[in-house]
């Protein structure tokens, strides 16, 4: 479980996240293509030419970003979709359908071969999904000299809406003096 609390002194913009990598198939078990992902997200952020959110949201229906029903992560890797082609995998902010700020289960990641499963609980409005698209064998090695490789793990980074300060209607990330920032994300593991 990750719980974060902080208080602002001057007015601050706050949207903290984690950057944990998961491959439930196991260490050095190959790419995450066959892991099964489910997210209660109905939209993703649209991005400008500099890959910054442009204030618009894209409905996931009929796109490789629709994980409302569980499916293999790798199913979308070769999709004919502009952002998928540019990133070579997922590196997108997914917006949860329920924006109440309540803490509950928002998704899961599963390796059906081993039976390992991760359930994602959070009170955050979004999750950035990153599938290690930019990782390559020239990066520093993992433990025991094992080489890194593209799609070797997936990140589920709960967060506020990125660049929200510049887009009315996005998550409020302004923290004023005396206000408290308090958020909780839990990764529950099962086997």
Where does each model-flagged region fall?
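Short, small-residue-biased leader/transition segments that mark boundaries at the very start
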Residues: 1-9
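An exposed, glycine/acidic-rich loop-and-rim segment of catalytic or binding clefts
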Residues: 8-191
């Amino acid at each position: 479980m990750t719980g974060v609390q902080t208080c602002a002194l001057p007015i601050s913009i706050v949207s903290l996240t984690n950057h944990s990598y998961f491959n439930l198939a196991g260490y050095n078990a190959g790419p995450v293509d066959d892991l099964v992902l489910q997210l209660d997200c109905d939209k993703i952020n649209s991005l400008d030419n500099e890959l910054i959110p442009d204030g618009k949201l894209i409905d996931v229906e009929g796109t490789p970003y629709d994980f409302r029903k569980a499916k293999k992560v790798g199913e979308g890797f070769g999709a004919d979709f502009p952002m998928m082609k540019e990133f070579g995998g997922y590196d997108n902010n997914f917006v949860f359908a329920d924006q109440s700020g309540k803490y509950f289960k928002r998704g899961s990641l599963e390796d059906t071969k081993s039976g390992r499963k991760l359930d994602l609980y959070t009170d955050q409005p979004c999750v950035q999904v990153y599938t290690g698209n930019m990782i390559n064998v020239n990066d520093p090695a993992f433990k025991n000299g094992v080489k890194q490789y593209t799609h070797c793990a997936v990140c589920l980074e709960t967060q506020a809406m990125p660049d929200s300060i510049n887009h009315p209607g996005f998550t409020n990330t302004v923290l004023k003096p005396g206000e408290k920032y308090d958020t909780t994300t839990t990764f529950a593991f099962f086997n």
